C-alpha cells in the first residue's frame, strides 16, 4: 500500500510539473497595424470629383479626386501668350546691323583707295586721314549697335525663360489638382465630399496598405536574447472564440528603449513591468484586419 501511494505521488508531481511548465502556444502578443497615409489637398479649389468611399480599394497612381482647374488653365494660356510676345520682340541682329556693315565695307574700300593715291602722290594726306577717321566712326557705331542689340536680346531671352518657369509652375499646380492614391490599399476615412472647397493642407482621405500588415508585439528583457531583426517567426491571428490562423512573419524592427507593459498586452513573463516593442511584417491574405489581436511564437 505504501508503494502504491509513493507511485501516485510521483505521477501527480509529474502532471503538475507539466502543467506549470513554460510550454505556451505563444511568446508575445500584440495587435495588427498597417502603414496609414493621410492624403491632403495640394491646391485650393472646389472638388469637382471625389469618387471613392470608405472601404474601397485603390491602387498606386489611381486618380480619386479632381480640384477645379479653371483659373490655372487660364493662367497657363496667359503665360503662353506672354512668351509669344517676348519672342516677337527679339531683334533680328543680322538685319539691323546690315546697313552699318555695308557702310563700313565702303569706307574701308575708300581708305584703301586713298592710301594708294597718297602713295602715288595723286592725293594729299588729309584725304586719307579723313577716310581712316570715317572707318573708325563706323566701327564704333557698329560695336555700339551690336552691344545694344545683344543686351536687348538677352533681356528678352531672360523674360522668355521666366515665362518658361511660370509655365512649369502652372503645369505642376495643374498636376496637383488631380489627386491620386500614393499607395495601394484600402480607404479608411473620407473627410470631404464632392462640391466642397478644398484648401492646401486640408485632409481629403486616409488610407492604409493592408496588403503588408505588421504585428506590434511586446517582448520581455529576457526574450531580447532570442529575437533579432530579420528573424522568421510564426504569427497567429486571433479571430476570437479560440479561432486562429497561422502566418509566416519576419521581425523588421526592435525598439531601442523599454516601456511599461500596455494593459491589453500579455507577455511571457506576467511579472515583467518593462517590455520592448517589436514589429513583425506579415503578408495579408485579406483576413487580417487593423486592430486584430495576434500572437507570436519565437
Locate each region found by the language model:
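Short, solvent-exposed secondary-structure boundary/capping segments
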Residues: 257-268
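Sec-dependent signal peptide recognition
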Residues: 2-13
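Long, amphipathic coiled-coil "stalk"/hairpin helices in large membrane-associated assemblies
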Residues: 25-89, 120-127, 189-193, 200, ...
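Surface-exposed patches in structured soluble domains
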Residues: 31-32, 48-53, 57-60, 169-173, ...
Amino acid at each position: 500500500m505504501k508503494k502504491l501511494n509513493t507511485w501516485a505521488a510521483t505521477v501527480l508531481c509529474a502532471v503538475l510539473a507539466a502543467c506549470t511548465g513554460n510550454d505556451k502556444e505563444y511568446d508575445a502578443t500584440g495587435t495588427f497595424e498597417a502603414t496609414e497615409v493621410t492624403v491632403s489637398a495640394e491646391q485650393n479649389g472646389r472638388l469637382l470629383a471625389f469618387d471613392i468611399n470608405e472601404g474601397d480599394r485603390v491602387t498606386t497612381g489611381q486618380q480619386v479626386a479632381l480640384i477645379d482647374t479653371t483659373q490655372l488653365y487660364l493662367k497657363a494660356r496667359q503665360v503662353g501668350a506672354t512668351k509669344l510676345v517676348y519672342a516677337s520682340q527679339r531683334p533680328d541682329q543680322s538685319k539691323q546691323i546690315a546697313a552699318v556693315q555695308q557702310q563700313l565695307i565702303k569706307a574701308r574700300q575708300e581708305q584703301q583707295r586713298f592710301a594708294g593715291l597718297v602713295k602715288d602722290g595723286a592725293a594729299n594726306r588729309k584725304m586719307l586721314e579723313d577716310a581712316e577717321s570715317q572707318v573708325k566712326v563706323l566701327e564704333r557705331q557698329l560695336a555700339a549697335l551690336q552691344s545694344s542689340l545683344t543686351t536687348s536680346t538677352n533681356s528678352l531671352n531672360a523674360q522668355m525663360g521666366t515665362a518658361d518657369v511660370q509655365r512649369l509652375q502652372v503645369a505642376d499646380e495643374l498636376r496637383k489638382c488631380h489627386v491620386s492614391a500614393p499607395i495601394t490599399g484600402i480607404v479608411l476615412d473620407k473627410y470631404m465630399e464632392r462640391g466642397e472647397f478644398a484648401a492646401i493642407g486640408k485632409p481629403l482621405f486616409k488610407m492604409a496598405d493592408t496588403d503588408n500588415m505588421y504585428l506590434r508585439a511586446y517582448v520581455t528583457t529576457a526574450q531580447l536574447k532570442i529575437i533579432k531583426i530579420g528573424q522568421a517567426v510564426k504569427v497567429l491571428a486571433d479571430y476570437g472564440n479560440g479561432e486562429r490562423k497561422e502566418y509566416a512573419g519576419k521581425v523588421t524592427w526592435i525598439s531601442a528603449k523599454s516601456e511599461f507593459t500596455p494593459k491589453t498586452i500579455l507577455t511571457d513573463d506576467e511579472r515583467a513591468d518593462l517590455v520592448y516593442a517589436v514589429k513583425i511584417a506579415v503578408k495579408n491574405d485579406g483576413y487580417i484586419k487593423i486592430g486584430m489581436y495576434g500572437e507570436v511564437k519565437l
